[in-house]
Amino acid sequence: MSEKSLDFIQNQINNAKFVLENYTKNKSGFVYSSRNIFVLIDKYVEDFLSNTENERWIIMPGLRGAGKTTILAQTYTKLNNTNFDSRRLLYIPLDKAVNTLGISLLDVLNAYQSFLGEKFENLSEKIVLFIDEVQADSNWGNIIKTNIFDVTDKVMVIITGSSAVALQAKNNADIIRRSRIEKLFPMNFCEYQIIKNSKYPIAKLKGKIKEAMFESENSEEIFSKLSLLKKDVNKYWSNIDDLEIENYITTGTFPFTVNKGQEKVFDNVNNQLDTIINKDIVELGTFDVKTLKSIKRLLYILADISDAISYAKLAKALDTNHVTLANMMEVLEKAEVLIKLSRLGSNLSKTTSFSKYLFMSPLYRASLLDVTGKINVYYTRQGKMIEDIIGSYLYREFVSKNTGSLEYDYASKGADIVLRLKNKKDIVIEIGRGDKSFEEPLATMKKLGSQIGMVICYKTNELKFENGVVKIPLKYFLLS
């Protein structure tokens, strides 16, 4: 047992409260609003302590900047403000322990048991552990399973980490069987309004809009159901400036960017992308220095293109081969920086030859365009940024839950996105900044025999049904 490990535990017990409070409120004492996932994580803790449920291992992976540490801080702070014994509440910033102090997760757990004077298998009272940036110790899964989960039911562990953590968990049968994974994605519009303006959504409206758009049998049914919600939709938007949509699309998808200047946000996000490449992606794949540098160049190219691009052209632009490029694309998908849409309706649909890529957050696209000096083409790329928003939503709600897949129609008059649900339903989606025609979705609907086509438009407030296609204002979609 090293003295360094014991000092670390003592410091965390004494000071974590003050460190984490900085994530929950500003210098004036104003308490920040929480994201939707906080309610879920808090419920897991309450159920564990009350013996209602026995979910004892919660894994919360997500992109850098999505607010993982803040969720831990809010959960820790709420519990610490009760009569729960603060000695049995431990926050572990594992990246600091491993990278700065040179102590492993196992060292930390052993030191904590020494501090308590109890082994985990002989605990008299329950404990809640918060482990931040768990990927700092590559053996985290086996350590938690062997030293906590398999020896006691009186310890709950809530961990955060990069997208690599989710992949490691899914590929380990022991972890996936024992844990619950709750991914943290970029903020939706309603979360953005909660965080920025303390503007809360209308009860049950989100579920009703989602049900109308994705559980209806045809476009006319979508139109009918959404028409019934018009009053509530208008009520929500009644005191929100339309510029808030543009602010959200450009800089509002991460909590740390809210109320910050655009240039500062772009600089921070570009630094964040560098960290993802140099740390998270290194954990997901084996690349030499030249290839790692090419990944950022690849992102610059993808930010500026308007549609699908062949791998041959990309490989030539990056002076690399097809295999290396395919590996680069795959690792950016695994890191959840990019969302892949396969080509619809051919043997190529599951290959990478002509895949289309969206960004998990439009802020990535805007920040990359800013670096290349092309932010002045913002309005010509705003349609793609709206597509990023919609693609990210569909990924979160369907792809990540394994209930659907995303494709696109490569034809010149084909639709932007096809959501292919596991129930064999195809939903054809066309997206635009201005007023779009019905031509593209109709062509793709005919090709697929689909009864559901929608056009989602930013610059329109009119809900409309025509020729088997429903036109939906972006204002409706953002509330789903």
Language-model segments: which ranges?
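Structural recognition of the conserved hydrophobic beta-strand(s) that form the central parallel beta-sheet
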Residues: 155-162, 183
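Interdomain motor-coupling "hinge/lid" segment immediately C-terminal to the ATP-binding subdomain
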Residues: 172-291
